[in-house]
Structure formats: structure tokens, C-alpha cells
């Protein structure tokens, strides 16, 4: 009887401990919401604005505007991107580029799913190679 009880308790404890651990990454690998750059406070990544294109996960990078040659234009790197998260890296392709191959960058979603760190795929802060974005919506 004692062996039976021990044999029942251990699996129950293992199941209970596994229930408390969840992966913040959605099972389909697609993020949602609007995320703001921790340092600039203005650069935003919006995962909800663009519809999926040909099955690809997409986001819109909004960097604001600047005046160039007397014209008010979007800041460099603004626009639509396709992405695919693979472990601790993200493949990013700027959809306004003539290049076909996506570029890999470091990527790490926080344990609580409220922020992520990503390699510098756009010129957010000069000299900074990894950037933190926090979810605001």
C-alpha cells in the first residue's frame, strides 16, 4: 500500500509542477499587440496592424517622421516586416526591400511575456546592438 501511495504521489507532484510553467511564446510563434522601444519611447512595433500575407507573420515598425530635403518622410527602417521566430533568434525581412532573404537577429521574449529583446534590425539607437521593447497594448 505504501508503494502504491508513493507511486501515485510522485506523478501528481510532477504534473502539478509542470502546470505552473507556461511558455510566453504563442504556439504559432506569432506575437500580438503594440510594443514600444524602452529607450526611445517612440519607436513602436505593431503586430496587430498588418494582416498575415501569404501565411507569413508580419508587423509594422513605426518610427515617426523626419524632415529630409524639405520633405516630411518616415524615419529609416519604418514600414512592414515579415518575421519568423526560431528559438532565440528571429528572421526579419523588410517588405519594402528588394532583397529576398530574411536576416537573422537575436530575440528573447521575457518569461512574463511583457517585453522582448531584439537585435538591431533598424537604426533605433546609434551604437546599441540589442534593443528592449515593452508591451503597451
Please state what every model-predicted region is:
Residues 15-18:
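C-terminal motif of bacterial Sec signal peptides marking the signal peptidase cleavage site
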Residues 20, 24, 77-83, 87, ...:
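Edge beta-strand at a domain terminus
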Residues 20-36:
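N-terminal helix-cap/turn-to-beta initiation motif at the start of protein domains
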Residues 42-91, 95:
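N-terminal glycine/threonine-rich, aromatic-flanked beta-hairpin/loop signature
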Residues 89-109:
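An anionic, turn-rich surface loop/hairpin at beta-sheet edges
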